[in-house]
Amino acid sequence: MKKHITFALLFAAALTAQAQQGGISGEMLNQIKQSYKATPADKAIRNALGGTSINTLALNQENRADFDTEFSHKVLSKGITDQQSSGRCWLFTGLNVLRSQMIAKYGLDEMEFSQNYCFFYDQLEKANLFLQGIIDTSGKPMDDKMVEWLFKHPLSDGGQFTGVSDIIEKYGLVPKSAMVETFSSENTGKMSNLIGLKLKEFGLQLREAAAAGVKPVELEKKKTEMLGTVYRMLVLTLGEPVSTFTWSLKGGEAKEYTPISFYREFLGNDLTNNYVMLMNDPSREFYKCYEIDFDRHRYDGKNWTYVNLPIEDIKEIAIASIKDSTMMYFSCDVGKFLDSKRGLLDPDNYDYESLMGTTFGMDKKQRIQTFSSGSSHAMTLMAVDLDKAGKSKKWTVENSWGSASGYRGHLIMTDKWFDEYMFRVVAEKKYVPAKVLDILKQKPIRLPAWDPMFADEE
């Protein structure tokens, strides 16, 4: 008995020693402290940072000269939209691409589609996507990875281009005057929180019913009743979507439309089949087709599918599109090195290395692998400045943060920033080389919904 006790004590002591070896010991702490040699410059920096933001002190004064705002190729843009305090950048961007086409086609002075109309059905469809996902996984335990992901993401106001195609192809479009913004459409946080909370409650009820042996047809009835509750919550916060409306083109004779007839008459794009998403993700193999599981806005919609390309290939496609006066859906890691006052995206905007006395040496691939960078915001790519050799020098996007933000509502990015923090564009297939389109014929490599590279754009 004593032998066993002695062994147990020795084993416990060994584990404790092993744990201590991985911690910060007193000796190690002394070494760390001694490695820091305070200098007069350090004291000045500490004093400054005590009452000033890091970005203010890291601002690179050598990069403060006025930057060139002229571009060799630019798509006509009329009016800046504002998503306010919402994560609907993906929707504003998609609609801005379409309104540019309508303005050019009909010579309009202005045009804006109702973001609120599309957003209403986006939220309803996402609610159904969640509830049906819960039914489909009802036989799996709560700690299953997919079940866990569903309950963590019942719905959000963010998204990407597949949401634009999913919603418009099914529900059409209306002018902004037919369904205007509300407080909750412009400030989505509380509404999304309440609907998400209710959906999680409904999700548990559906799992309990399935576990009790309720038949699929009865689960469908329960889901329909639940969606009725969500519909009411959406009507109270966003208003009820119009089914018909009257509208005239350039002061002509007014005509009655449905959202679908309006879309088909004035645009009629096949958003599902005429566009292709292109990604620059150096952490994965190029010239391959990828599909993100369950990453769609409708249960009966299409999973997000894209072709992964080197950055130079994407630039060639983007340049071809802009030269032909066609805007593009574009997404990037907008918060990196953004000088919001000037509306300039440039890795040379801030010199964090000189301020902190160290280097930040990860490349794009390493930043993706370590969850340090990823697409966070969608905007409309609408201009490029080319040198005499036809190579890009800088780019411009039309943003959806209002006309007072950035450079007159736009952001200008250097080509270097484009290389490092641009992640995807959506191009019309007519601008994409045949060899790239052929990649779409491959069986896509399926990635899980929780892959960190594919969070919603907000």
Give names to the regions the model predicted.
Residues 213-458:
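Active-site signature of cysteine proteases
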Residues 1-22:
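Bacterial Sec-dependent N-terminal signal peptides
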Residues 21-79:
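N-terminal regions that are enriched for targeting/export leaders
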Residues 85, 93-94, 98, 160-169, ...:
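Stable alpha-helical elements in mature extracytoplasmic
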